[in-house]
Amino acid sequence: MNGLGRIVIYHTSDIHARLGFGDRLASLVEPGALLVDSGDALAGSSVFYVRDERVATDLARARYSALAVGNREFHYLHRLFLARARKLPAPLVCSNVIDVWRREPVFARELVVRAENTDVRIVALLVPQYRTGSGWEKIFGWRFLAPDVALAEMFDGAQLMPTIVLSHLGLDADRDVAQRWPQLAAILGGHTHETLPQPEMVNNIPIAHPGAYAAHVGRLELIVENGGTRLAAYELMPLL
């Protein structure tokens, strides 16, 4: 990838069904920018299904491009997981969960989206609920891959565009991922409810955590040049 481009991404995480942020968030996101979430936007959980996820209205108003699967989006029962996904206004993404029974897809393993004039690949990582090969796979049909295993599959070939990770692993795990995967453009994280005023730079990769409960949204700006990316600016902006 040659030339100069710009990628602007707005990022939330761990909203946990807080309401009332959608209109303000929509007013902040400029044309051409992406809006993504790193998981746990909903009220339900992996074992508890909420029929009326009221936060979906705010997610729709804000116009998200992608929603990572967090603990609150995932459900062990496929039919409830699928019903939950169908009520959401943006696609779910999860790269390290495999449906070994090959049922109707609930989420994408990756997405390619356009930010201004640049294609961006979005992958997402969920903290594994049990080990690969566990007996639970035969009960529920879900296989959890270690983050490194999933990323190795994602990078099995030429890297043609910047790759952004939506991580629901927690900050410490995000640091480990950045150390081992220098080809990543950025890690936009959540799960541990930490608020970073500025991204941590690990292995020249920005790791951004905007905190929980829709209190803030992070605005990350990357410059694309010479086949890679660099951090140009970051701002943590109040929402609620």
Q: Where do the model's predicted regions map?
A:
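Acidic, metal/ion-coordinating pockets
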Residues: M1-L240
